[in-house]
């Protein structure tokens, strides 16, 4: 058994490539990331690891990276692995602009990132990337939001709302209950609020460990400040309390 465990390009007798499956386990241990498509925006939200007391917070890397002026990428899994993927994706986006004089489409970039991940499952002397990504943005001259996911195996898929990383099952169940594909969040505020609510299902420490980036058409990408995120968290907690009080009243009336 151990031989199949170690060798990357060998299938086990029952058809598994264990190293790729272990890479997925690394993703499940990574901090949670969520992507939600609104009517005219895409929001990426991430759980940030707590910084230590003496750590310089300015160079704590963001979990959301800009690949081009209209595409952002968030990840879950090994930070160092993600840096390589992000760098490769940026270079590809730049060379596409230079060669074709046109920005990449979001799907093209997703396919490229998934292709890099796939190559690292089939080569000797390398290991798979321990990273899943969420890639969000708008195509040039198009107002339709796009959200894709890639996995260590090289699979990529398109989503209305998706989550990766630890506790992603809990967050996905929340999104399945609260996200309506026929009527996605109509405003940026609604979309951000749903993203923050989904993250609060698993992030215990509130606003200080949440990161939110909003992508709108025409290369309009904004990272929300801690104060803005805090306002959303406070509002959500107030609504929760009001709901609990209403439920209590209903019970006591019965």
Swiss-Prot record:
Function: The proteasome degrades poly-ubiquitinated proteins in the cytoplasm and in the nucleus. It is essential for the regulated turnover of proteins and for the removal of misfolded proteins. The proteasome is a multicatalytic proteinase complex that is characterized by its ability to cleave peptides with Arg, Phe, Tyr, Leu, and Glu adjacent to the leaving group at neutral or slightly basic pH. It has an ATP-dependent proteolytic activity.
Sequence similarity: Belongs to the peptidase T1A family.
Positions of region (Disordered): 235-254
Disulfide bonds: none
GO biological process: proteasomal ubiquitin-independent protein catabolic process; proteasome-mediated ubiquitin-dependent protein catabolic process
Subunit structure: The 26S proteasome consists of a 20S proteasome core and two 19S regulatory subunits. The 20S proteasome core is composed of 28 subunits that are arranged in four stacked rings, resulting in a barrel-shaped structure. The two end rings are each formed by seven alpha subunits, and the two central rings are each formed by seven beta subunits. The catalytic chamber with the active sites is on the inside of the barrel. Interacts with CIC1.
Other remarks on this protein: Present with 16800 molecules/cell in log phase SD medium.
Gene name linked to the record: PRE6
CDD domains named in the record: proteasome_alpha_type_7
Localization annotation: Cytoplasm; Nucleus
Cited InterPro entries: Ntn_hydrolases_N, Proteasome_alpha, Proteasome_alpha-type, Proteasome_asu_N, Proteasome_bsu_CS, Proteasome_sua/b
Residue list for modification Phosphothreonine: 60
SMART domains: Proteasome_A_N
Protein's UniProt name: Proteasome subunit alpha type-4
Matching SUPFAM superfamilies: N-terminal nucleophile aminohydrolases (Ntn hydrolases)
Main subcellular localisation: cytoplasm
NCBIfam families linked: PRK03996.1
Pfam family name, one: Proteasome
Amino acid composition bias (Basic and acidic residues), ranges on this chain: 237-248
Gene Ontology CC entries for this record: mitochondrion; nuclear outer membrane-endoplasmic reticulum membrane network; nucleus; proteasome complex; proteasome core complex, alpha-subunit complex; proteasome storage granule
Record keywords: Cytoplasm, Nucleus, Phosphoprotein, Proteasome
